[in-house]
Amino acid sequence: MEGQNTVLSVVGPLATNAASLRLVTQALLQQEPWLHDPLVHEIPWRADQESEIKSAKKLCFGVLRTDGIVNPHPPVSRAVEMVVKALRSAGHEVIDWQPPSHRTINDTGFNSWIYDAGKDVRSAFALSGEPMAPQVSFYQSLEKEYTASEIAAINVEVRRLKKEYMEYWNSTVNKTGTGRPVDAIICPLAPFPAARKEKYKYYGYSTWVNTLDYTSVVVPVTNADKSVDKKDEGYKAIDEQDKRTQDDYDPEIYDGAHVSVQLVGRRLQEEKMLAVAEYVGGLLHA
């Protein structure tokens, strides 16, 4: 949304491996984009962040297996555990990540996308006449536009949430055994593998990253396997939203689908997280 500065949009490049992502990021920074876009930070490529990871004898990761709102499908849970196992086998530490509520973060971030009652989204669709997918059709019925005071209050809340999460992250220095807070977080990218058409109904595993302005790199891990990733027929849902997501899981349909996880770092840690992603990818696919 033009003029919405609470949670800014970014371009997320895609590549077949982390080394290619590093190359394209370096190439972009060499063009000094801060001379062309006033919102770009004037920060050239920082090789020290990259070398810090490559020279570390031991890293520590936090693992978020579920956000407590919507639990991941079996293939996604298995992928997270594969990453945990690979890191521990390589001598690194993995601790449980028990952060402040992601629900509050997600709800606050979502509110920033509807400041204008959906006018920007509807005008974009009107240019082509393309119908809205069911997942975003709610933009057609929004009526309330946020006032300046309401937007300011949300901005204050986002700042509070960032500080709260930062303080939790800092506190992990007492749990890691490395003398540093957790280096990165391992968590699902979405509760499902590669999404089925019109089934991408929950965005919470990426919304919190965007709202806090953190750095995330997605790493491919495995493929769904119907012989392993069985549906839990006795599953007890958290609520109706979680139930709908779990009901959508079908081992036969998802069989062979790509499954990824995301590795999350703090603000402005692109070089560091690309190095982490390259290392983790190497462990998984050695």
Predicted regions and their residues:
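Buried hydrophobic packing segments
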Residues: 21-24, 140, 263
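Short hydrophobic alpha-helical runs that function as membrane-insertion/retention elements
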Residues: 216-220
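Short, well-ordered beta-strand elements within core beta-sheets of diverse protein domains
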Residues: 9-16, 142-144, 262-265
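Glycine-rich phosphate/pyrophosphate-binding loop shared by adenosine-nucleotide-utilizing enzymes
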Residues: 259
